[in-house]
Amino acid sequence: MPVNKYNIYIICKDEEIFMERSRKLYEKYKSKICHCQWVPAEYLTLTQCNKQMLKKLKTLYNTKQKSIIRKLGCIAAHRKALLAIYSNQTHNNLILEQDADLMISLPMPPKDSCYMGGWIVPPRITRAGKDKVNIKPKTGLNKIDYDKFKIITTHSLYIKTPEEATNLLDKTIQPEKLKPYDVFLADERYFKQFYYPSVFVQEAHVSEIDDKGADLNYYRTLNYGLTMKVKGTKKKTKRRTKGGSKKDGSKKEGSKKKDTKCK
């Protein structure tokens, strides 16, 4: 029977970052960790010989070429992590991306594969950040109702067995056309559960994959974004009254109109 400890695979660009990340985890949770392994991030190089690979990824028509290359690199890096799990035949596998930041005490390995963090969005992913998802998850494992919501981002994925990792690896290789990895996992409904509250968030920084702002992905993944405000309708702005002073915004003497100066 496998030891009930984590085998952690950290995707990052160099060994120095890996050593720092793994050291922090070991310092606090040595009793819960069996092994940590570095998975080098994949920085793909576009040449005249391989530019056809850009057509393999299904994206919006206006997606920048640089972003497509990064998303393909993300898929390639996760394939390497899955292959490492298969090669090592490890259980209780936690795949972390470089920006995964531990938010709560590391729990004991869950009994099933799950998201250990992410962003909960509507079933139509294009409505993410626009339509609010109203759910009240309990502490621990929660079932994903794909008719009501999906989870995107791939910074912390928990895969229970090497067999499951092998199955997922096969799924990422077979398609003629690929999707961004998080969209692919959501559309395939690969993970059936998520752990709440989020064990890992994306730390505040500019994402190397999607160029999002420094804090945006942090708030999206903090408790799965359930407490994050969604975009509302545009507020109507009051028009200035005619004849109002542009310098001091003062009202005309004797005017009964309310001051409409923007504050």
Please state what every model-predicted region is.
Residues G232, R239, G243-G244, D248-G249, ...:
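Small-residue-biased low-complexity repeat regions
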Residues P2-L96, A100-R239, C262:
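An acidic/histidine-cluster motif and surrounding catalytic segment
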